[in-house]
């Protein structure tokens, strides 16, 4: 009998005596494999009949070095649960009535956005609703919940009359000012397509889905979505990931059980995948669906079915050409990496780049994803939260001396100290953020299982699971943070799903929010008191998109360099704040800030004040 954690493609369980040693082996194996493939191509080129000699070039990869365990102590920086005191009363509704329909256990996302343009982050919780014909007697339909930040981290619910008080089986959220009017708009993914809400500027949102042309198909189960400027024309386009081909009837036919008797939530291998959608923003004319022509709809070459079961997406310029690419996290099919060809089309490079599979060549159950230039030399890393008994992936860009035709990545989770500790839990929301303001991005994972009764058949698993926080010690790797260092509230067991960050109380450090499936969210205030300095930057595009999504910011201070990329799309079905935060540690001044705006224009600042937010407008 297969349990929910024993997926057909799972490798046998291995016990590692030394994760760092194994990490080194994995990384060298990846390099060796690339070299063998290239060498094989060269041999074939020599033996193949030809009219003229062909010169074969081979890209040599620098040998990676496994990180040692951090010697520096993890700082004490506590998080405090302020959910109730902040005025948050939302509770997620999944409509479950005993039939175990898959959307019920997937939860929903959350977004920080400044919808009223008063300078502090408001909150939007995505919600499910009751299945048709199964609402409890007298129960009002559930909707998303909008909370206005009244300053100092106190919130007031303003959902009623906002236009977002519409019953939907909601999943995820993307935030972006698609019409460049200075107000953030909202796209909600749902079981049943997508919904676009235009921010009217008076606390109300108008449903413009039909006129904008972004509804998708009523049969779509849309999940992760992202606003980004695919063509560098100054307005935001929209990527919408879909999960699987699903309906209540299809779900009922799966007939999956957890113990041979009782029905359970069917694993995604039992459902056919679904293509994502890509919409080009054509200004006042609305959006144009370019999904098929753009190359983002990839078929399995053997079966012809969609090779997408998307739960996460991360926009990021992976090859440094000034055009935003897309990394897509898929559940039980290979992850996809789409390189932007500058003409409205994308090339899928997941397998070729080393991004698609784990170190054994297997697919994983990928959920949330985030991208960050987390090293001192600015290497891109993709953190991907995976299923239980699968490690969190940390796909790190590799040096390719002499150039190369495409980017290369290797999963270095074990070598960086993340792999082993992250293996057991079922990871959903995940993001990088510098919680202690020391100048190094840390990593937070929000966890929770799919099955309420999983502990009865797997002693090592629980439905409610604690979050995991990894402190970045620089080149020495990451250390798992303990409750004594970050507080008990952060590690309270939850049925965790979505997650996001923002500075909710204006003190400069980053606070976090988690969502639960069929439960209340958790809003955690960062109460670190380390005396570290910071700068916060809010970018405003003029020639580029108003949100400056796709901009890259490079900070130099004290002989060290940090990078941040502007996007709100992070984690699982969620959106974090747009302003970027740089921790400075004990430094109280900044050398320079270099901004590369979408499209490639650069701007350098040398007089940025510390310990405050600075608004930077793109030069005309």
Give the positions of each predicted feature:
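Ser/Thr/Pro/Gly-rich low-complexity linker/stalk segments immediately outside membranes or between
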Residues: 46-71
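Beta-propeller blade signature
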Residues: 143-150, 274-281, 339, 396-397, ...
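Gly/Ser/Thr/Pro-enriched helix-cap/hinge segments flanking short amphipathic alpha-helices
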Residues: 4, 14-31, 36-53, 75-78, ...
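Beta-propeller blade termini
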Residues: 107-117, 148, 169-184, 196-198, ...
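Repeat-based blade/solenoid architectures
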Residues: 88-109, 162-174, 213-226, 271-272, ...
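Short, conserved, GDST-rich strand-edge loop motifs in beta-rich repeat architectures
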Residues: 56-57, 126-141, 242-271, 445-463
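Asp-box/WD-like beta-propeller blade repeats and closely related beta-sheet repeat scaffolds
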Residues: 158-178, 183, 189-230, 240-269, ...
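Hydrophobic beta-strand segments that make up the repeating blades of beta-propeller
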Residues: 79, 120-127, 181-190, 238-242, ...
């Amino acid at each position: 009998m297969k349990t929910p954690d024993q997926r057909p493609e799972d490798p046998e369980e291995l016990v590692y005596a030394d994760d760092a040693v194994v990490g080194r082996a994995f990384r060298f194996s990846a390099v060796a494999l690339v070299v063998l493939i290239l060498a094989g191509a060269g041999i074939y080129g020599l033996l193949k009949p030809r009219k003229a000699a062909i010169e074969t070039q081979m890209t040599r990869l620098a040998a990676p070095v496994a990180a040692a365990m951090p010697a520096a102590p993890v700082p004490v920086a506590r998080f405090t649960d302020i959910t109730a005191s902040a005025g948050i009363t939302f509770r997620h509704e999944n409509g479950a009535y005993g039939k175990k329909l898959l959307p019920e256990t997937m939860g929903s996302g959350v977004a920080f956005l400044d919808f009223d343009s008063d300078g502090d982050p408001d909150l939007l919780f995505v919600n499910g609703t009751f299945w048709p014909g199964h609402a409890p007697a007298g129960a009002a339909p559930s909707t998303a919940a909008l909370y206005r930040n009244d300053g100092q981290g106190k919130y007031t619910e303003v959902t009623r009359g906002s236009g977002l008080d519409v019953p939907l089986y909601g999943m995820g959220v993307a935030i972006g000012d698609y019409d460049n009017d200075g107000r953030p708009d909202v796209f909600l993914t749902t079981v049943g397509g997508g919904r676009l809400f235009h921010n009217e500027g008076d606390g109300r949102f108008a449903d413009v889905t039909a006129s904008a042309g972004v509804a998708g198909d009523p049969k779509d189960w849309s999940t992760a979505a992202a606003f980004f400027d695919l063509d560098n024309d100054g307005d935001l386009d929209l990527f919408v990931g879909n999960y699987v081909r699903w309906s209540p009837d299809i779900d009922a036919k799966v007939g999956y059980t957890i113990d041979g008797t009782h029905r359970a939530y069917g694993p995604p291998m039992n459902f056919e995948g679904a293509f994502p959608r890509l919409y080009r923003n054509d200004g006042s004319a609305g959006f144009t669906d370019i999904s098929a022509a753009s190359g983002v709809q990839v078929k399995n070459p053997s079966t012809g079915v969609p090779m997408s079961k998307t739960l996460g997406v991360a926009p990021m310029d992976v090859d440094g050409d000034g055009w935003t690419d897309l990394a897509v996290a898929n559940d039980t099919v290979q992850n996809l990496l789409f390189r932007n060809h500058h003409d409205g089309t994308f090339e899928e490079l997941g397998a070729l780049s080393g991004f698609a599979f784990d170190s054994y060549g297997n697919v994983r159950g990928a959920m949330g994803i985030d991208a960050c230039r987390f090293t001192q030399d600015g290497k891109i890393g993709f953190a991907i939260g995976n299923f239980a008994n699968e490690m969190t992936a940390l796909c790190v860009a590799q040096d390719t001396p002499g150039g190369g035709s495409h980017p290369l990545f290797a999963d270095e989770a074990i070598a960086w100290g993340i792999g082993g500790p992250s293996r057991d839990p079922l990871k959903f929301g995940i993001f990088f953020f510098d919680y202690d303001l020391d100048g190094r991005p840390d990593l937070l994972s929000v966890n929770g299982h799919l099955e309420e009764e999983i502990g009865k058949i797997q002693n090592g698993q629980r439905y409610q699971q604690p979050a995991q926080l990894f402190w970045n010690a620089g080149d020495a790797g990451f250390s798992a943070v303990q409750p004594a260092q970050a507080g008990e509230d952060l590690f309270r067991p939850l049925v965790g799903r979505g997650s996001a960050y923002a500075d909710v109380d204006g003190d400069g450090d980053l606070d976090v929010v988690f969502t639960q499936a069929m439960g209340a969210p958790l809003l955690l205030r960062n109460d670190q008191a380390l005396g570290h300095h910071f700068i916060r930057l809010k970018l405003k595009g003029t020639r580029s998109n108003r949100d400056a999504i796709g901009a890259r910011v490079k900070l130099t201070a004290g002989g060290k360099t940090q990078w941040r990329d502007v996007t709100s799309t992070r984690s699982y079905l969620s959106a974090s704040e747009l302003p970027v935060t740089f921790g400075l540690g004990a430094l109280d001044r900044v050398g320079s800030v270099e901004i590369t705006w979408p499209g490639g224009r650069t701007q350098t600042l040398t007089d940025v004040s510390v310990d405050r937010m600075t608004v930077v407008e793109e030069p005309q």
